[in-house]
């Protein structure tokens, strides 16, 4: 019992008072913390793990900015400036993810096992991503597509944590292109809404609040925002943020010009067709799911 109180005190000092995140470059450290601390000191139902998929799931298609060869960057500068001024540039990440032209490689090969290990311990685990819900090019509903894509191609499945509430449309939040943020099979798709704001709305909708919220993200901004929103909503929840900082990327400098130009052309041809959605009944038939 004394050891448990010491552990909780240490977490309070490092995670709340100093407002610092635990920086890691792989999932092994997080898994170790679960084995040594969280599982021993909390019941599974008292925990919630949230994985921010945006920067930790797949290797970047292109090298990060500081890794780009200066000569290559100089040649690409005019094209990059045009992209930055194009209002459709917000869809680039989703375009890369959904296009068959680009091979997707896991940034951490242990990611599927990490999710499975947490799930097999009966600890609730969900994911959040910055994608846009609804129709996207030839995909009827992106939020359904990403859940099915991850399960089919990488054996990554978040659907078991809240099986009775596997579909929610957050139409109390701001709409974007006639769509709203959605929770589908364990994945929150934020749809141009802050991931932290969406998480709080998720807690309200589910009438659920963990004693400990453990978030893994490649964005310090999201971690800080989540901590601040959580503190305003409930002071009784312990927030533990893991900043996943893995700089691994593909060496594609030689193909930069081809890839950027191809992305530009695809971006200009993006099509979305979304009628307004008006339902927010978690128990109703899913109007997105056309599989039946």
Swiss-Prot record:
Gene source species:
Rickettsia bellii (strain RML369-C)
UniProt keyword annotations, A-Z? Signal
Which residue positions does the secretion signal occupy?
Answer: 1-19
Pfam families xref list: DUF2608
Region of interest (Disordered), ranges: 271-292
Q: Which InterPro entries match?
A: DUF2608 (IPR022565)
Please report the name of this protein according to its UniProt entry: Uncharacterized protein RBE_0637
Top-level taxon of origin: Bacteria
């Amino acid at each position: 019992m004394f050891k448990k109180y010491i552990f909780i005190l240490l977490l309070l000092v490092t995670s709340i008072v100093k407002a610092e995140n635990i920086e890691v470059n792989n999932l092994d450290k997080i898994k170790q913390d679960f084995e040594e601390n969280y599982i021993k000191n909390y019941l599974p139902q008292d925990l919630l793990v949230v994985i921010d998929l945006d920067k930790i799931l797949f290797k970047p298609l292109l090298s990060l900015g500081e890794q780009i060869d200066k000569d290559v960057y100089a040649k690409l500068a005019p094209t990059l400036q045009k992209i930055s001024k194009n209002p459709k540039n917000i869809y680039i990440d989703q375009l890369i993810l959904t296009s068959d032209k680009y091979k997707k490689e896991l940034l951490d090969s242990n990611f599927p096992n990490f999710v499975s290990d947490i799930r097999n311990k009966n600890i609730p685990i969900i994911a959040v991503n910055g994608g846009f819900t609804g129709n996207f090019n030839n995909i009827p509903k992106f939020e359904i597509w990403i859940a099915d894509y991850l399960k089919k191609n990488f054996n990554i499945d978040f659907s078991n944590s809240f099986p009775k509430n596997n579909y929610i449309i957050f139409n109390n939040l701001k709409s974007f292109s006639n769509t709203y943020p959605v929770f589908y099979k364990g994945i929150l798709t934020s749809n141009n809404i802050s991931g932290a704001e969406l998480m709080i709305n998720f807690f309200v909708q589910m009438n659920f609040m963990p004693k400990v919220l453990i978030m893994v993200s490649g964005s310090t901004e999201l971690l800080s925002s989540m901590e601040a929103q959580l503190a305003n909503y409930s002071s009784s929840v312990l927030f533990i943020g893991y900043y996943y900082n893995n700089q691994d990327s593909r060496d594609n400098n030689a193909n930069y010009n081809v890839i950027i130009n191809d992305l530009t052309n695809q971006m200009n041809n993006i099509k979305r067709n979304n009628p307004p959605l008006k339902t927010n009944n978690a128990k109703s038939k899913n109007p997105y799911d056309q599989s039946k």
